[in-house]
């Protein structure tokens, strides 16, 4: 997934050449400064490989993307895991099936995502409790939180949901 600057630091992260780690580097020296994720050094769930990651805004966790399946040009479904760096704990984001378009809350304590055209919310501070936000999603009729094919293609975006600045509200587009 290339070079990803780490917010509020002079560091960046990148997936290792062997695809087993997320490595932190210094922009100034280009040298490795830390291993942020190692597929062979986790507690809890075990995975054999991963396709990408999304760092939380507070830099304490990341979403690890596995089993990626393309939908359109930019969008995909995948099985995501929550990785907590301090404890090295790896746990599924959801047990309900592949997810699309996950987004972190600004404080890194919640993750919203789309599954089957509906939006779900996972609260990390409440034992990763999952709640369904929308219930009207219907294939080829109602789409919540992700763009339809035309909007993804013409406007080059694959996410249509976000949190407000303090993370207390979720905003999304609904297509019907």
Cite the ranges covered by each PLM segment.
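Beta-propeller folds
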Residues: 1-176
């Amino acid at each position: 997934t290339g070079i990803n600057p780490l917010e509020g630091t002079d560091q960046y992260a990148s997936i290792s050449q062997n695809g087993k780690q997320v490595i932190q580097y210094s922009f100034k020296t280009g040298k490795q400064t830390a291993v942020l994720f190692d597929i062979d050094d986790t507690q809890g769930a075990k995975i054999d490989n991963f396709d990408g990651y999304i760092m939380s805004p507070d830099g304490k966790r990341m979403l690890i993307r596995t089993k990626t399946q393309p939908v359109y040009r930019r969008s995909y479904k995948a099985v995501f895991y929550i990785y907590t760096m301090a404890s090295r704990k790896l746990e599924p984001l959801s047990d309900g099936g592949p997810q699309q378009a996950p987004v972190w809350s600004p404080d890194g304590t919640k993750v919203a995502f789309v599954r089957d055209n509906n939006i779900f919310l996972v609260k990390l501070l409440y034992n990763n409790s999952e709640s369904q936000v929308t219930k009207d999603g219907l294939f080829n009729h109602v789409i919540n939180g992700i763009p339809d094919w035309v909007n993804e293609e013409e406007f080059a975006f694959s996410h249509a949901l976000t949190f407000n600045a303090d993370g207390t509200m979720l905003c999304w587009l609904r297509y019907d």
